[in-house]
From Swiss-Prot:
Disrupted-gene phenotype: Deletion abolishes the secretion of Hcp1, Tse3 and VgrG proteins, all markers of T6SS activity.
Residue ranges of coiled coil: none
Gene: tssA1
Signal sequence segment: none
Function description: Core component of the H1 type VI (H1-T6SS) secretion system that plays a role in the release of toxins targeting both eukaryotic and prokaryotic species. Forms a dodecameric ring-shaped structure located at one end of the T6SS sheath. May properly attach the pre-assembled sheath onto the baseplate and/or stabilize the sheaths tubular structure.
Native source species: Pseudomonas aeruginosa (strain ATCC 15692 / DSM 22644 / CIP 104116 / JCM 14847 / LMG 12228 / 1C / PRS 101 / PAO1)
GO cellular component, one term: type VI protein secretion system complex
Protein name: Type VI secretion system component TssA1
Alphabetical list of InterPro entries matching this protein: ImpA_N, TssA-like
Quaternary data: Homododecamer. Interacts with TssB1 and TssC1. Interacts with TssK1 and TssF1.
Length: 344
């Protein structure tokens, strides 16, 4: 597990972010070992590709944090953490990136381009590693639930079984994923849910924090990662302890308990999802706004609508007075007059 406070400690009082390690031998070695070994031919034999030695990647990346606060190093540290610690590792790694940006925006590497009006392109490019294929492939493989009957069920298999995405190679059925959740340890499920919530919160905070500093036009789109996290939470809503308790037919939980470890899991009723598009709470509102933002980023990037949508997100949890103050600053005094004195 990452010790985030230790990793965030300033390199020195005079130089909190240390040196730029872009051409440093240790950083180049980190990039090399993080790639693993590609498939290669030796004589007549074809040697299969080998994944990176993730413990070694994490150790070297953590060591480099003592010399530099660098988002490129943080990305490789995040990858190793996901590979080794799953969803907990993802949440911790995203928290590290979030705090790097929050505490060290002026000095974290890559630096803003001082010769081009503090252009953030290099920094944004480094942050896009959060939605690049190497990390997303690791997230797909994260065990979402561990069942005594089925073993670990990764995110890819769970999303396919829940009907949220389709993969021809995945065969787990809705009944089986329901059985896996019914068979899983309740404390482990609760910990997984907390990690998902934390990862989603940190991803949203990273996006909004960057947008506040550089503007939405030059901001960061973590849509692909947020979509996976949102869909993982949907699986929990459908099959997890709370969702399953509401959706299973009467007596189905008892049937599931009796069949722990048994093969015929089909007797467990598959949870019925909510009607598509139904909005039941503010969290659903925020998720729908995220979906709208993803559409505009992908299909109408020049549209001004995302600016309004992002502003709307900040108002979802505000009270009426806060909304008036945000939208019509000069109108708050009129609102106070209309409202009259508060009753004692």
């Amino acid at each position: 597990m990452l010790d985030v406070p230790v990793l965030l400690a300033a390199v020195s009082p005079d130089s909190p972010c240390g040196d730029d390690l872009e051409y440093d031998a240790a950083f180049l070695e980190l990039e090399r070992i993080a790639q693993g070994q590609p498939e290669r031919q030796m004589g007549d034999a074809v040697l299969p590709a080998e994944p990176p030695e993730w413990p070694r990647v994490r150790a070297l990346a953590s060591e480099l944090f003592g010399r530099s606060k660098d988002l490129r190093v943080a990305n490789l540290l995040l990858q190793s953490n996901v590979a080794l610690d799953g969803l907990d590792g993802l949440a911790d790694g995203l928290l590290l990136v979030r705090e790097l940006l929050g505490q060290y925006w002026d000095g974290v590497y890559p630096l803003l381009d001082a010769d081009d009006d503090n252009d953030p392109t290099f920094r944004i490019n480094a942050l896009t590693g959060l939605v690049a294929e190497p990390l997303l492939q690791l997230v797909w493989a994260i065990p979402l639930v561990r069942s005594r009957a089925f073993g670990p069920v990764n995110l890819r298999a769970a999303l396919n079984a829940a009907g949220l995405q389709r993969f021809a190679s995945e065969t787990l059925s809705p009944e089986q994923i329901a059985g896996a959740f019914a068979d899983a340890d309740a404390d482990a499920l609760a910990a997984t849910r907390r990690a998902l919530d934390g990862a989603q919160e940190h991803a949203l905070a990273i996006e909004s924090g960057v947008a506040e500093r550089v503007g939405s036009a030059q901001g960061l789109d973590l849509g692909p990662l947020r979509q996976l996290l949102r869909q993982a939470l949907q699986v929990f809503d459908l099959y997890g302890p709370q969702g399953a308790g509401e959706s299973l037919a009467p007596g189905a939980e008892a049937v599931a308990d009796e069949q722990v470890g048994a093969a015929p899991v089909a007797a467990v009723a598959a949870p019925a999802p909510r009607a598509s598009g139904e909005i039941a709470n503010r969290e659903d509102v925020l998720r729908q706004l995220d979906r709208l933002l993803e559409y505009y980023v992908r299909h109408e990037p020049s549209s001004p609508v995302p600016v309004l949508l992002k502003r709307a997100k900040t108002l979802v949890t505000a009270d009426f007075a806060e909304i008036v103050r945000n939208l019509i600053p000069d109108g708050i005094s009129q609102f106070e007059t209309l409202r009259g004195p508060e009753s004692e």
